[in-house]
A protein has these predicted regions:
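Terminal targeting segments of Actinobacterial cell-envelope proteins
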Residues: 1-29, 532-534
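Extracellular, repeat-based ectodomains that mediate carbohydrate processing or recognition
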Residues: 29-38, 43-534
Length: 534
């Protein structure tokens, strides 16, 4: 008999097994978390980029009080001394202790040192001891504080009928500038444009740079080939090492050396190479005013990593357009500064756009090439007014300040105001200009005015802290053409950084957001390809 087959029992048989899912379904399910992760990364990236560009409030730079004179003679109508070319330095041990040196051109060649013990609120003049056996013609001073708070003052003594440098001297002060030691002779004759720089870490190390002339005529060098040199002291200015050449042989008309020392001990010297400019260098203008040299000049940075023994050079810019004629013995210096990270800034004026503007170049740490020039002054391009003679200072927090002469308020382009602008992003952008001077100065008052070459000095001066900056300049408001009186004036600004993220954090968010965005897009593309394959 055959077996009888009945209907299956209902409710007792298990459903078909689903332990094994098809590969297609696995791919579809796997693409979903990939897509979710990709979208998440893209959203995070967008947020990071938005946050990196955000700031709770913008930076502010505002004038504090009003400008005031620095030199004692400014308060006397009987003293018509022409103070100019200030160097302002701050004591790193006692920050309220400031010192400023100044050159005096008329009525007699001389120099001065003023010190402050209250952050620049008040000033007193310190007597400069005369070297024995020298003519009493102190001139062209410079000043620097060592890391231990010792103040060092350099100056030249003039000699002969031509009043040319006869010797270079250094005096020191261990009492915050109240008194100076007997001067020590450092260099001999024809040392021009002497500058001092102190190592910010090594307390006893000083550098001196200068232009060493072979021969001179009246307010001129007789030919090219006068090098920029350097010497070093490792004992606080008591003794000095053998000189070394800074400027390369290719730069035959190098002038106006400006030294600065970085935190790592690297020595930088920024100088001008005036190219084929015989008009100014060899006195072709015979001390008379007129159109400037028509050819280009160059800005050159020399760098030494072995305390001045050997040097390398880079050309910052070789297309500078001169703004005016000048006396080569007393040129206008370019300005150089270096921040704690080793970023180098250089600044000078150039008439590339038809009238003088302040330009800034920067060299990032480890970089081999300079940034493109950045126009600092916020005037309308080609407005017919001059902005010139910039001075740079870097605050401890990395903010960059630029001080300069500014004629934007004078359509005739003759009267100087003094402006300050700040950058919180390494020179990429600047705050609007703040006017420090309460009254304009006549740029036609100064030594050489009768010949059409008035001299307001070789530089401005400034020190910067995280919350403030103090600027000094040559002011002629008390002078008239008959007296040529010039004074030093000062003014301070208060600075508030933009509230928000530091530049380092902003960069990290910016680059990190970019990378996360790319990763998120890649994951989204992967998820899309998986679904299309199904």
């Amino acid at each position: 008999m055959g077996a009888q087959v009945g209907p299956p029992e209902t409710g007792t048989a298990p459903p078909p097994s689903t332990d094994s899912t098809s590969p297609e379904r696995q791919r579809r399910r796997g693409s979903l978390p990939v897509a979710v992760l990709g979208v998440s990364l893209v959203l995070v990236a967008i947020g990071a980029l938005l946050v990196s560009g955000s700031s709770d409030s913008p930076a502010t730079v505002r004038l504090v009080g009003h400008d005031q004179p620095v030199n004692e003679s400014a308060r006397s109508s009987q003293d018509i001394s022409a103070h100019n070319s200030p160097t302002l330095v701050r004591n790193p041990v006692q920050p309220a202790n400031l010192a400023v040196s100044s050159r005096i051109d008329t009525p007699f060649f001389s120099c001065a040192l003023h010190v402050s013990h209250d952050g620049g609120a008040t000033w007193s003049q310190t007597a400069i001891p005369a070297p024995k056996g020298e003519e009493a013609k102190c001139f062209a001073p410079d000043v620097a504080f060592s890391a231990d708070g010792t103040l060092h003052l350099s100056f030249v003594t003039l000699g002969g009928r031509g009043n040319v440098p006869h010797a270079v001297w250094v005096s020191n002060s261990n009492d915050n500038g109240r008194t100076l030691s007997p001067p020590v002779r450092v260099l001999g004759p024809l040392a021009f444009q002497v500058r001092l720089a102190a190592d910010p870490v090594a307390p006893k190390r000083l550098y001196m740079t200068w232009l060493q002339a072979a021969d001179v005529g009246t307010l001129k060098f007789t030919g090219p080939g006068n090098p920029i040199n350097v010497t070093r002291s490792d004992d606080g200015g008591v003794t000095w090492q053998k000189r070394a050449r800074v400027s390369g042989a290719a730069h035959e008309r190098a002038i106006a050396p400006s030294p600065v020392v970085g935190d790592d001990g690297t020595l930088y010297v920024l100088y001008l190479d005036v190219g084929q400019d015989r008009l100014d260098y060899e006195g072709g203008h015979q001390g008379k005013g007129g159109p400037p040299y028509a050819g280009p000049s160059s800005l050159v940075l020399a760098r030494s990593r072995d305390h001045g023994a050997t040097w390398g050079e880079s050309v910052v810019d070789d297309r500078l357009v001169p703004m005016k004629r000048f006396l080569v013995f007393l040129p206008e210096y370019p300005s150089v500064a270096v921040d704690h990270a080793g970023r180098v800034y250089a600044s000078y004026q150039s008439s590339n756009l038809g009238d003088p503007d302040v330009w800034l170049w920067s060299l990032a740490p480890g970089a081999s090439s300079w940034s493109a020039p950045k126009r600092v002054n916020d005037t309308r391009p080609r407005d017919g007014t001059a902005q010139y003679l910039p001075k740079l200072a870097v605050a401890p927090d990395g903010r960059l300040d630029v001080l300069y002469y500014d004629r934007r308020a004078d359509p005739e382009n003759l009267r100087n105001q003094v402006s300050l602008q700040s950058s919180f992003d390494h020179g990429k952008s600047f705050t609007p200009a703040v006017t420090l001077s309460s009254r304009a100065s006549d740029s036609r008052i100064g030594f050489g005015a009768k010949e059409g070459l008035p001299d307001l000095g070789s530089r401005l001066a400034m020190v910067s802290s995280d919350r403030a900056a103090l600027g000094l300049w040559t002011d002629t408001r008390a002078g008239v053409p008959e007296t040529q009186k010039q004074d030093l004036a000062e003014a301070a600004v208060a600075v508030t950084a933009p509230e928000g993220l530091s530049s380092g954090t902003q960069d990290a968010l910016r680059y990190g957001g970019f990378i996360l965005g790319l990763a998120g897009l890649a994951l989204l593309a992967l998820a899309l390809n998986r679904r299309r394959a199904d």
